[in-house]
Structure formats: C-alpha cells, structure tokens
Regions:
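Extended alpha-helical targeting/anchoring segments
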Residues: 1-356
Length: 356
C-alpha cells in the first residue's frame, strides 16, 4: 500500500473522520486485518468537549496538526543523523506556575473541580534529525512509541503511560498518577496525597470506559502499583472492560480522549480550567500516539514525556496533577523531576537556573 497521510486541524468530527479515512482504505473490513496505521492525536482535540467560551490558548507550533494518521510501509534508517539543540526557554516562570496552582486550589475550594493537571512548556531552537532524537530517547525507555514524522513536523515520545489498548472486545487503560525521583518508591507508596489523586483518576477512567463497555464488565485488576518508568518512580493502575458489540474506534476515542490523568476531574470542568490558566496550548503533549490495525485493535500511548519538532524548534511539556493539599513549590519541582531525565537523555540538559 502506498504511503498516505491524513492531517486534521479542526477538532469537530475528527475521530469519525479518522475512522472513515481508514475504512476507505480497507480497514475494519474482511481482508484488511493485516493493515496497520500510525495514529497521532493532539491534546487540542479536547476543544470539542469544552463547555465555556474562554478562548483556547495559542498553540506554540502552528505547523503541528491536531491529528495525523499514516498508512503504508515506512522504515527508519539503521543509523539516524545527529541534531543540535539550542538554549531552552520556559513559557511560565516558577512564580507564574505557582500562581496558577493556587488558582486551581481556589477552584477546588469552590467545588468546581477535584483535581486539575497543569503543564508548563519549554522550547528551544532545533536543527537536525528527529530519528536521532528518538534513538537517544530509546536508551531511557526502550519500549517507547515509534516517532511520527511527517515532513515539516515530528512527534517523538518516551511515554511510559498506556492510554488505551484494544484486543477484540477487551479494552484497557493504565493511568499514571504520582511521581517521585528514582529510588523513592516507598515514599510514593506512603503518600496519602498521591493515593487520593490517583484514585480520582482511576474512577474517571472507569467512568469513561463504562460509556463504551458492557454494563458490569469494567474493573480494575491492578490498583496503585509502583514502578520505575522512564527514569522516575510512578504509581500505576489498570482499568479494563468488555466493549459493547459494534463499538468502533471513533466512538471509543470520543468517550475517552483526552486521558483523565492529563486533565483532572471532573474531566470537562478540568479541561475548561486548563484552557483558562495555561499560557500556551499543549501541542503534541497530553494526547495519544501509537498504531491502529485493520482488525480494529490498537495500542495508544499517552503523550507525556513527548517532544514536538516543528518550524526549527523543539517543544516539551511537563507537569502534574493539582489537588487541594498540593504544595505549589513542590508541584513545580515535581514537573522538573520528570523533565530532567528526558533532557539528559537527549544530551541537552537545561541549566538549573532556568528551572526556577
């Protein structure tokens, strides 16, 4: 099959358009079981579920579409080229980030939300090869999603978090909430704050899957396990269910995207507050990246720990969940706990002074 690329720049009807485009090319039909497509979904698709009229923040890389889907064989060279990354700049100062966290706490006090995920954005000049960047990240996370490269833009991820997997009528998600530096798993397990934050998201994911699953089949066989992933300690759960007959990819994505661990709870209220507080859009981050097969199965990672490359710049977003008892300074530092291993892995550590 020849290489073909679909790019979408509007959120309305995006999931249905992706499914339709794939069906037109033989997916989800007899004889198409062996077909495979790459799928990228940007966080900006969440605009479709927003309820308030607050304008969405501007996207920092205009060349990046809201969604992309590619079919056809594509091979990476065995030895990808090099790259050069300039000085990193952050969109938020630490003080601005902490002020936004206090705004979330005020919203929680009013009863508007229970938890909100806030992220900050870094950017730097970039020249070179996205494949080389992906190879460097592989040292940090060997099972990271394959990069999505489309001419003038690329998404390269070291995500440790599963957004959604489907095999036949079984579907599952593995949300991550709770982070500590490597070696601090015991501290993470004993944290009441992280446990509360995590259970909120597990409940949200249970609710999302219930919208497309047979009643009574959604369960959580693993709850609050701790694992070392991508250079840090994480708290992870598994939520799974049995899909209703006839449910297709578009309906599944409309019910579940974006992942609850990158929004907060309730999801729609959290998405509205994120749009009001964050100074720039999330671009390639906090979305999904992976593959979808002709038989309807798919594997999609949540695009945390993810770089976007476009217009001779590289972008990274890092953050975490905010609850009532969050300490603003600690939350800002936790975001850098996530960023440091990534920047070190690509050979471009940010100076400590720029992290404050």
């Amino acid at each position: 099959m020849p290489d073909e690329l679909l790019e979408l720049r509007e959120p309305d009807g995006a999931y249905a358009r992706v499914e339709e485009w794939l069906r037109e090319r033989g997916f989800f039909a007899p004889g198409g079981e062996e077909l495979v497509a790459e799928l990228y979904l940007g966080y900006g698709l969440s605009r479709a579920i927003r309820r308030t009229r607050t304008p969405s923040p501007p996207e920092p890389c205009a060349a990046l579409p809201l969604a992309g889907c590619r079919i056809g064989a594509r091979e990476w060279p065995s030895s990808s080229g090099g790259y050069v990354i300039g000085a990193w700049e952050r969109t938020w100062t630490a003080a601005e980030h902490e002020l936004a966290i206090e705004e979330v706490r005020s919203a929680i006090a009013r009863g508007d939300v229970y938890q909100v995920n806030l992220v900050q954005h870094l950017r730097a000049p970039f020249a070179g090869d996205a494949g080389g960047l992906s190879q460097r990240l592989a040292a940090l996370r060997p099972l990271h999603p394959a990069p999505f490269v489309a001419g003038d833009w690329a998404v390269v991820s070291a995500s440790p978090e599963l957004f959604l997997s489907r095999r036949g009528d079984r579907i599952w998600t593995m949300p991550i909430k709770g982070t500590r530096p490597r070696g601090a798993a015991a501290e993470l397990r004993s944290s009441e704050k992280d446990a509360a934050e995590h259970v909120m998201i597990v409940d949200l994911e249970r609710n999302d899957l219930s919208r497309v699953c047979v009643a009574g089949t959604v369960r959580w066989p693993e709850l609050m396990a701790t694992r070392e992933l991508a250079g840090v300690e994480h708290m992870v759960s598994t939520v799974e269910g049995t899909l209703r007959e006839g449910v297709g990819p578009a309906e599944i994505l409309a019910a579940t995207f974006p992942g609850g661990s990158v929004t907060g709870a309730p999801k729609i209220a959290a998405v509205d507050l994120i749009a009001a507080l964050e100074p720039v859009g999330r671009g390639a981050s906090m979305g999904a990246l992976g593959v979808i097969r002709g038989n309807g199965d798919f594997d999609l990672a949540l695009t945390i720990r993810t770089f976007a490359i476009a217009e001779q710049e590289i972008h990274l977003w890092v953050g975490g969940g905010i609850v009532w008892d969050s300490d603003p300074a600690h939350e800002v530092e936790e975001s850098w706990t996530k960023a440091r291993p990534l920047l070190a892995a690509i050979g471009s550590p940010a100076p400590e002074a720029s992290l404050r």
